[in-house]
């Protein structure tokens, strides 16, 4: 148990105060303050062998000793009123006598609920348990779950997460004599005991509907981003100086590619929204996976503005307090937010079903979608870039209108850089894209795409060369290349496809080949940093980024700040009307569960023979690597989902 200077420790459940005495001596030359407490009356406590001497050591070292302190009611203790501690320590808890595991679980749960009332915001709770009691994989051997004290699950009830498990250092506290086994002076077996360290979890925050204003194809548009996507907006993972793993992976890839080719990344802003006309330029995109959007408002941008002015019009990025934010250079948006309930009348229809493709795209409002890929906007940027180069001629540098950043590297001549002395350039953009997919373990509703495009002489076999370079960079992390018609697919287990390399004949010369590389930076970050879950990438917990500030090189595994989170399974059954849109169901799951549902399985369906109704039964698996998730909290989310389904989709819960 390491303690920093000027720290305060609260010890609860002491018996003979031998641990308190050892700790007092250990930290006697530091500014650590120690308060030792026990449940018993003073007279009863003094009956323990050595208790009087140990209490004297604690007091002589400047510590305090309190009696009749119930560790399950610390908030009610008059002597602790107004005090907070950096560490709360409970060594080898036990209900006394021949207690069963259920009673001891209940003791732990009530202790955790109590201790958070006197714990500082960044404080720790230390619980020492005998080997096997905790019920975590750190126990050797590990008991069956139902026969353990389920310490992590009990802590989650108090919104605490298990952040570390390490051996109990009994040799460090030489005078410590454990007591209390079956309410006697007998001790527990502490030699192979484990110290469980718990910290506070961030609270769950409610979903918001974000109101966005941006310029799209010459129009000023306003629309709502669906509530279940609100956590993915305005995060700035790719901004300059970011140590987020998504940015680290992008830098790693670009640096590796820049050893063979020149790479130019654009810094131009592009909107989240696409029109159907733009989507039609990219036949590789599945329209059923698009988030279709209804506009709240559309205005024609004044013709008096120049094209440059139009771009500048949409560079403002506002947070919910109206402050400017330019974290993500690809977010050409103005964003404000409100609580879901306050804008439900406007936001309920913002997510159009993928089956609504029969709406006339040439109608008054047209069809818009959140960008499922950066490809349509890359086409536009490349066209604009070509026009600027052609128009520049002898007028000099056009960098003011065509912003890009050269990736550090060297132009390579020869077989890799180009052919016949010609060096090819890879033009790239990266940013957030959206996929309206059902909830699944590796189905990402939003992720960062890195898109690269280059034109090469066909005799150089550019797909093969790019594939070989990507293979060199990514094979050590479990990525393999699979040939397919027109290119390559990058595959990895267990997530599947993490990228593609596609080739097409360049429009200018038949002898040239246009090659496009599309990479899912989020899934690659999971692979390169050994993350247990892609949802960790979106954690607001500062401990996540602190890890990468110290360990920025791919290949160094991430050490989770939440260990062994429990899975919870709940079923939900309901009757629907004649129409049922499953995508809306999954959208509500993400919103109601705060993203904690990782799998949804259809268990059963039944169509009523006389009524136009169908019954569905689904099984939902709740699990979180970012927050404390207790059985109570998961059940609350599940009840919220039932309420959402009843009020928004008009289903009847069975």
Residue positions per predicted region:
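Conserved class I S-adenosyl-L-methionine
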Residues: 4-24, 31-35
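S-adenosyl-L-methionine
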Residues: 46-80
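A short SAM/SAH-binding and catalytic strip from SAM-dependent methyltransferases
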Residues: 75, 83-105
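A short glycine-rich, Lys/Arg-flanked "PGG" loop and its adjoining helix->strand segment in the class I
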Residues: 105-121
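Conserved beta-strand signature within the Rossmann-like core of class I S-adenosyl-L-methionine
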Residues: 121-129
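Class I S-adenosyl-L-methionine
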Residues: 133-211
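Class II aminoacyl-tRNA synthetase-like tRNA-binding/catalytic domains
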Residues: 212-449, 453-455, 493-518, 526, ...
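A carboxyl-terminal module marker
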Residues: 476, 483-654
């Amino acid at each position: 148990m390491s303690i920093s200077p000027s720290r305060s420790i609260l010890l609860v459940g002491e018996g003979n105060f031998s641990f308190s005495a050892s700790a007092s001596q250990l930290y006697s030359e530091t500014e650590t303050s120690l308060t030792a407490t026990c449940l018993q009356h003073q007279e009863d406590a003094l009956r323990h062998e050595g208790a009087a001497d140990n209490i004297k050591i604690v007091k002589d070292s400047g510590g305090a000793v309190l009696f009749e302190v119930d560790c399950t009611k610390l908030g009610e203790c008059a002597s602790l009123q107004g005090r907070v501690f950096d560490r709360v320590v409970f060594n080898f808890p036990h209900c006394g006598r021949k207690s069963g595991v259920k009673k001891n679980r209940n003791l732990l749960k009530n202790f955790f609920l109590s201790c958070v009332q006197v714990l500082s915001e960044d404080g720790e709770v230390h619980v020492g348990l005998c080997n096997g009691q905790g019920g975590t994989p750190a126990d050797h051997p590990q008991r069956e779950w139902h026969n353990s004290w389920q310490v992590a699950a009990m802590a989650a009830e108090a919104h605490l997460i298990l952040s570390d498990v390490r051996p109990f250092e009994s040799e460090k506290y030489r005078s410590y004599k454990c007591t209390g086994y079956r309410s006697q002076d007998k001790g527990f077996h502490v030699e192979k005991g484990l110290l469980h360290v718990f910290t506070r979890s961030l609270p769950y925050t409610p979903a918001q509907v974000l109101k966005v204003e941006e310029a799209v194809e010459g129009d000023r548009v306003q629309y709502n981003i669906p509530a279940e996507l609100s956590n993915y907006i305005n995060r700035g993972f790719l901004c300059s100086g970011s140590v987020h793993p998504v940015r680290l992976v992008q830098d790693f890839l670009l640096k590796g590619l820049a050893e063979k080719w020149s790479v130019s990344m654009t810094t131009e802003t592009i909107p989240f929204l696409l029109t159907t006309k733009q989507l039609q330029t990219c036949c590789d995109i599945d329209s059923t996976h698009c988030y279709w959007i209804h506009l709240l408002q559309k205005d024609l941008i004044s013709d008096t503005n120049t094209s440059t002015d139009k771009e500048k019009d949409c560079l403002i990025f506002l947070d919910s307090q109206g402050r400017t934010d330019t974290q993500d250079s690809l977010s050409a948006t103005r964003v404000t937010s409100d609580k879901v309930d306050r804008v439900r009348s406007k936001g309920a229809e913002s997510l159009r079903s993928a089956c609504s493709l029969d709406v006339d795209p040439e109608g008054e409002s047209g069809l818009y979608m959140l960008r499922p890929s950066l490809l349509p906007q890359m086409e536009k940027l490349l066209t604009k870039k070509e026009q600027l180069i052609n128009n520049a001629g002898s007028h000099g540098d056009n960098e003011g209108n065509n912003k890009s950043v050269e990736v550090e590297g060297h132009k390579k001549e020869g077989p890799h850089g180009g052919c016949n002395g010609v060096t090819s350039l890879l033009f790239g953009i990266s940013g957030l894209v959206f996929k309206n997919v059902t909830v699944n373990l590796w189905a990402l509703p939003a992720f960062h795409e890195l898109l690269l495009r280059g034109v090469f002489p066909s005799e150089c076999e550019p797909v093969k060369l790019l594939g070989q370079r990507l293979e060199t960079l990514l094979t050590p992390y479990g990525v393999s290349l699979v040939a397919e018609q027109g290119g390559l697919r990058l595959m990895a287990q267990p997530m599947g496809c993490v990228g593609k390399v596609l080739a097409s004949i360049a429009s200018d010369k038949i002898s040239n080949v246009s090659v496009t590389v599309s990479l899912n930076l989020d899934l690659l970050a999971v692979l390169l940093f050994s993350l247990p879950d892609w949802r960790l990438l979106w954690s607001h917990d500062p401990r996540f980024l602190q890890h990468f500030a110290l360990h920025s090189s791919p290949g160094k595994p991430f050490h989770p700040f939440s260990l062994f989170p429990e899975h919870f399974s709940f079923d939900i059954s309901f009757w629907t009307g004649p129409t049922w849109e499953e995508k809306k169901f999954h959208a509500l799951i993400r919103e109601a569960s705060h993203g904690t549902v990782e799998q949804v399985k259809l268990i059963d369906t039944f169509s009523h023979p006389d009524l136009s109704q169908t019954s569905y039964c689904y099984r939902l698996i709740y699990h979180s690597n970012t927050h404390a998730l207790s059985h109570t909290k998961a059940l609350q989310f599940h009840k919220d989902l039932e309420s959402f389904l009843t009020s928004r989709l008009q289903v009847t819960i069975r």
